[in-house]
């Protein structure tokens, strides 16, 4: 009788551990997939930047320091893997791209250029997509981090050495 009780307790504990493990794996994979979505949107923005620079160069040759800054930040952002470091570079890149678009106010020909207007619209759409992807990612990170912190999941998470995931913050 006692051996049946022990087997039952071990079986219940094992099933419980497997369920928690599967939930942790699911949440981790959701977080990784959500980061991939952000990365795709950031790459879309990076792909638009050279076109924007070319459009601005044609009309605003006096803005060379801003153009160089945007080009440099784009290269840096593409090379960084760590989320917190990339977040800082992407935030600065976002600011510089907005400054570059604002330059159009000083150049009426640029402001009226159809190609520039289309790029401006595309960048705005990508910025919106980045924000949507960022919100989804941060929600997924919140879920996995909450699971890592919550009992009884934290027992399995700590045993398996699960680490907190980093949030990704950009200016809205």
Regions found by a protein language model. Name each.
Residues 1-172:
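A helix-centric hydrophobic-segment signal that preferentially recognizes long
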């Amino acid at each position: 009788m006692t051996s049946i009780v022990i087997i039952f307790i071990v079986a219940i504990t094992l099933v419980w551990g497997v369920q928690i493990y599967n939930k942790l794996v699911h949440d981790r994979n959701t977080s990784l997939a959500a980061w991939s979505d952000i990365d795709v949107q950031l790459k879309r923005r990076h792909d638009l930047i050279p076109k924007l620079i070319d459009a601005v160069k044609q009309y605003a040759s006096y803005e060379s320091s801003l153009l160089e800054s945007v080009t440099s930040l784009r290269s840096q952002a593409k090379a960084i893997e760590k989320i917190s470091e990339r977040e800082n570079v992407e935030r600065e890149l976002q600011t510089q791209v907005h400054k570059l678009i604002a330059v159009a106010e000083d150049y009426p020909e640029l402001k009226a250029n159809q190609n520039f207007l289309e790029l401006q619209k595309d960048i705005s759409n990508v910025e919106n997509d980045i924000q949507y992807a960022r919100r989804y990612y941060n929600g997924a990170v919140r879920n996995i981090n909450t699971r890592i912190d919550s009992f009884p999941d934290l027992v399995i998470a700590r045993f398996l050495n699960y680490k907190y995931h980093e949030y990704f913050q950009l200016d809205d």
